[in-house]
Amino acid sequence: KKLSQQLVKAYDELNITKTLNIQPVAGFIKGETAAGTGLSTKTADYVRDIQKVNTSQLVKLFDKSQPDGNINIFGKSIAQVLGDGGSNRKGTTKVFASEALNEKDIYTYAQSLAGSIPLVEVRNAKGVVYYAKYDGKIINLRNYSTSAQESKARWTIDIIGNKDINKVSNLSDNKFEIKFR
């Protein structure tokens, strides 16, 4: 019942402000799936719609024919960083000047890419990784990067196995990254 109320509230907020805020919903997804219960059909459909919108936007980032390299996260337009410390020339890594986003925003965005599959936390010697595997794809969110000094990245999302990105980027790489400063 609480999840339904949060969904209605998020939908109402979207209609009024034209800004989608799924942060409360992400918390319920994690809670419901941890409790061993599945999501209701309505909730699963809602989450799948958010996933489609955000994944479509993500795929466009790697499309070399798209002139706009910005990304919209929770109503905030985040500019891509080009040049030194920015996105790489090959096109597999995009860096964003995302200082306006907090850790929860970035985590929730990564969760939206994974849909109803909750991100699982793993700690290692380098830091923390949250990951989700679905439909032959993997979404990793990590708080470390080997290029952190150059890119100034706080968080990196790895997108592994997304054939749509391969198609639009004309690259055969299996792993693409978006980095958040």
Indicate where each model-derived feature is located:
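Low-complexity, glycine/serine/proline-rich disordered segments
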Residues: K1-I117, E121-V122, I160-D164, S172-R181
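Functional cores of ribonucleases/endoribonucleases
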Residues: I117-F180
